[in-house]
Amino acid sequence: MNLRLCSGCRHNGIVSEQGYEYCIFCESVFQKCTKVQKKSNFHVSNKLIHLRNVLRRLLSHQCSGEIISELLDIMEKNQISTDDVDANFVSSFLKANERINKKDYKLVFEIINQVKDEKLNLSTEKINEVVEIFKHLVFFCQENTPSKTINYSFFLDKIFDITSVTKNLKPQTVKNYTKNNSNQLVWENFLAHMRSKKRVTMVEDYGHEYVFVDERFSTCSLEV
């Protein structure tokens, strides 16, 4: 998928759907015809807008440098390696820090990225790959799962891993292990769906050959 230039924000962020186009950067929607669109298309549009916000956040430094320094001091005091920093550790730190009002997974991802001092591989080509896989995932969840909501931190970590954007943004596990296993099951079913779709339609990997490699994911522990 090639992202075209948006006439509004002048970024290469135009994604085409049947009957309309939208920009993942400035959220502009451009109607191509008067046909009423399916609700699912606009559902995907909203999800991609949120994805845009996540990608922008990961490439920014909105978190105060004082907060990062404080976290690094705690790590040094307790001899905690950057390799051991995950979403659970950062979330616990944020909950104990009264100076931070908004504690969401985007902030957690940003802090992990800064603490590990990692340069994310988010070139235009990589962004295209992430957007394409995420779009198929949203459609799959919409058609095959009871809930239309998506655990962004869980699935973006999976997508970032297979696209080699980063392996460091590990999501926070939840106390409900059934929910963790359910997300893993959805991901594995999505990969199986994409492999099956490839065989049926003879589409050449959607430009993402790695999506169809069996050994890239582990077996889900949820019995069905």
Swiss-Prot record:
Pfam families: A2L_zn_ribbon, Pox_VLTF3. InterPro entries: Poxvirus_VLTF3, VLTF-3_Zn_ribbon. Changing C6S: Complete loss of transactivation. The keyword Metal-binding applies. The keyword rRNA processing does not apply. One of its GO terms (biological process) is DNA-templated viral transcription. Changing C9S: Complete loss of transactivation. A zinc finger (unnamed) spans 6-26. Keywords: Activator, Late protein, Metal-binding, Transcription, Transcription regulation, Zinc, Zinc-finger. It comes from the Viruses. GO terms for molecular function: zinc ion binding. Acts with RNA polymerase to initiate transcription from late gene promoters. Interacts with the late transcription elongation factor VLTF-4/OPG110. Interacts with the late transcription factors VLTF-1/OPG093. Belongs to the orthopoxvirus VLTF-3/OPG127 family. This is Viral late gene transcription factor 3.
